Amino acid sequence: MESNGVPMITLSSGIRMPALGMGTAETMVKGTEREKLAFLKAIEVGYRHFDTAAAYQSEECLGEAIAEALQLGLIKSRDELFITSKLWCADAHADLVLPALQNSLRNLKLEYLDLYLIHHPVSLKPGKFVNEIPKDHILPMDYKTVWAAMEECQTLGFTRAIGVSNFSCKKLQELMAAAKIPPVVNQVEMSPTLHQKNLREYCKANNIMITAHSVLGAIGAPWGSNAVMDSKVLHQIAVARGKSVAQVSMRWVYQQGASLVVKSFNEGRMKENLKIFDWELTAEDMEKISEIPQSRTSSADFLLSPTGPFKTEEEFWDEKD
């Protein structure tokens, strides 16, 4: 199924995923009618891939929008959609993975997910989601048993595929050493200001699809940056191509062989973001983008602890690898 010209990517497990999805993180209108209407509008204009998570607190609104889209005839079947959600760190324990997924399904009013991701490579003491995580709650993840529980979720049919998010090459190696079903996706920050070249090469060699988040700098998030949208290089390319800076950034990610999720509640920008697949950046454009200074926008500070598995950003991201 293609919608509004969005290509389908075949993951290593054989299932197909729209190359572009709508993100649902960090909305300022969580749990409101406006949030539901934004998701409904996204379906109406052509989005078929939605990326949510237990921690985003957007699952229930997305579920309501899906139900309404079916009632309105915007889609004929839930099978037309590709729904991704994520396992929160406090549930990243072998005995809590399946209950957490089942809770997400209840929130979404769905019988299955298309993709379920481990949100971060770290666990927390079990409990409800909190914005301020006590440092003594941060624990190392038992990759072997947690991933085995993820595999069980797929085997039981509650999700069609499983993957990870915010994993470095080193952490992927640790997880895959004991995996019976390899992860099909690693969702990470990637943009013209964070190329992730080494990670992309590793994932490609291991048949793991990169899904890029924060493609436009995560503007509006507490850790957001204007580096992408203010880039003179990207502005020059955008003017030359008759495109927006956002479209250039998204197109660059796609031309690197990655899929992506982006978020907008503005109908005009929703439509604009879909229009990145019928044109290409030139080799000269790509060369210019390759020279843009690199910096990470995402911060792992909230998951760092003197007594936890990761004490510094460098340890969390394995930046020195």
UniProtKB/Swiss-Prot annotation:
Pathway: Alkaloid biosynthesis; morphine biosynthesis. Pfam families: Aldo_ket_red. Substrate binds at residue 119. Optimum pH is 6.8 for reduction (forward reaction) and 9.0 for oxidation (reverse reaction). Disruption phenotype: Plants silenced for all codeinone reductase proteins accumulate the precursor alkaloid (S)-reticuline at the expense of morphine, codeine, oripavine and thebaine. Residues 299-321 are annotated as: Disordered. In yeast (Saccharomyces cerevisiae) engineered to produce opiate alkaloids, the expression of COR proteins leads to the accumulation of neopine and neomorphine as major products. NADPH binds at residues 27, 51, 165, 187, 214, 216, 264, 269. GO terms for molecular function: codeinone reductase (NADPH) activity; oxidoreductase activity. It is found in: Cytoplasm, Cytosol. The active site is at residues 56, 119. It catalyses: codeine + NADP(+) = codeinone + NADPH + H(+); neopine + NADP(+) = neopinone + NADPH + H(+); morphine + NADP(+) = morphinone + NADPH + H(+); neomorphine + NADP(+) = neomorphinone + NADPH + H(+). Changing residue 111 to D: Normal neopine production. Slightly enhanced velocity for reversed reaction. Optimum temperature is 28 degrees Celsius for reduction (forward reaction) and 30 degrees Celsius for reduction (reverse reaction). The keyword Cytoplasm applies. One of its GO terms (cellular component) is cytosol. Latex secreting cells (laticifer cells). Expressed constitutively in all organs with highest levels in capsules. Restricted to the parietal region of sieve elements adjacent or proximal to laticifers in roots, stems, leaves and carpels. Useful marker for the forensic DNA analysis of opium poppy. This is NADPH-dependent codeinone reductase 1-4. It comes from Papaver somniferum (Opium poppy). The lineage of its organism: Eukaryota, Viridiplantae, Streptophyta, Embryophyta, Tracheophyta.
